[in-house]
């Protein structure tokens, strides 16, 4: 609930249930300055058990319902590449998300064109594959401190 007050967008909506909950919370708090809350739907295009997100099949089944939520604007899709192997290892993941986005947007133009993919170790490849938003915190702020 606090996130909808603190953030301009949420990039990790990994289920229709979470989208529905966010929509309800935004609605309960009244109209947001600037309109609906922009969200990116997290897609696990690799079926990696270590990652959260819609599978491509789940997204296809549930997208229309999420797009119909009045207090959310689906700005695009988000994914995380493989954690090992560097940028080239993540290229197929990024290409699959771009292709999925193109196909889904051809069927329903309410889905935003944003592609949030790429982090510090693979953002160059993500941009080559069409990323419109990269997450490069470690490149800007350095490594996270080890837990105490």
Where are the regions that the model predicts?
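Divalent-metal-activated hydrolytic enzyme cores
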Residues: 132-133
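Active-site loop ensemble at the mouth of alpha/beta enzyme cores that anchors a bound cofactor
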Residues: 146-148
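Conserved alpha/beta-domain cores
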Residues: 1-123, 127-129, 138-143
């Amino acid at each position: 609930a606090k996130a909808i007050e603190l953030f301009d967008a949420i990039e990790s909506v990994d289920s229709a249930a979470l989208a529905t909950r966010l929509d309800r919370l935004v609605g309960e708090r009244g109209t947001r300055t600037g309109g609906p809350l922009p969200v990116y739907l997290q897609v696990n295009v690799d079926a990696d058990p270590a990652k959260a997100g819609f599978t491509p099949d789940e997204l296809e089944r549930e997208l229309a319902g999420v797009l119909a939520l009045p207090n959310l604007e689906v700005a695009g899709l988000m994914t995380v590449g493989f954690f090992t192997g560097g940028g080239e290892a993540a290229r197929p993941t990024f290409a699959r998300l771009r292709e999925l986005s193109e196909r889904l947007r051809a069927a329903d133009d309410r889905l935003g064109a944003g592609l949030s993919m790429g982090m510090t170790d693979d953002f160059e490849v993500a941009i080559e594959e069409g990323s419109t938003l990269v997450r490069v915190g470690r490149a800007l702020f350095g490594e996270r401190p080890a837990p105490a």
